[in-house]
């Protein structure tokens, strides 16, 4: 269950809240609670080309499991009578996360654009991460081309034993877009690569947009 609210406070500032129910279940045991996500975005510049954002995720009280799955039967050695007992469990915190990001758009002209972005993620149960990336787009009358690249860094990134996530290191990709007809239809081809400790992932896609 999610309940979200978003509002644009001014031409430059917008924000949102998301209240959600968090539930985790094991055989005959369950932990349930609520958590909050919140974020705010600021846009400035003559062409709205400078953007800042900050968000908090999974903010909420600790959770703990309860249910019949925690009950055990033990034999009282003095009376030889079986007694039902409830195991004590410790509560645990949600994996909260703080994200801070910024981007800058270089609008060279109507046909060329470069976007540079960076972000920082502070994780409560894993290593903090720094991200950086860029996207360049070139448009012509017959086609448009987009080139993308990025990098995710965390401590001990190049140590295969101590690295905490597979989704780190370099990534890149490109897109071709070919318009056809007079109704705004186009055909697109996308390719992306992401490095991981498992050898990397290649993704290829194609799309067709039919105009009115």
What do these predicted ranges mean?
Residues 1-212:
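Outer-membrane beta-barrel porins/channels
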């Amino acid at each position: 269950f999610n309940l979200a609210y978003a509002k644009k406070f001014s031409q430059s500032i917008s924000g949102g809240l998301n209240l959600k129910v968090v539930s985790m279940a094991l055989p005959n045991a369950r932990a349930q609670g609520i958590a909050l996500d919140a974020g705010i975005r600021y846009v400035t510049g003559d062409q709205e080309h400078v953007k800042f954002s900050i968000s908090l995720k999974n903010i909420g009280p600790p959770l703990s499991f309860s249910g019949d799955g925690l009950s055990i039967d033990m034999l009282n050695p003095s009376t030889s009578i079986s007694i039902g007992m409830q195991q004590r469990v410790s509560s645990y915190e949600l994996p909260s996360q703080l994200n801070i990001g910024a981007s800058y758009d270089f609008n060279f002209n109507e046909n060329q654009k470069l976007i540079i972005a960076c972000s920082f993620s502070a994780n409560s149960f894993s290593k903090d991460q720094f991200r950086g990336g860029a996207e360049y787009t070139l448009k012509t009358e017959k086609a448009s081309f987009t080139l993308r690249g990025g990098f995710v860094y965390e401590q001990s990134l190049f140590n295969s034993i101590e690295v905490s996530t597979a989704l780190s290191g370099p990534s890149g990709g490109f897109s071709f877009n070919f318009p056809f007809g007079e109704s705004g239809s186009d055909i697109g081809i996308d390719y992306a690569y992401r490095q991981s400790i498992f050898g990397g992932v290649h993704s290829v896609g194609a799309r067709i947009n039919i105009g009115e």
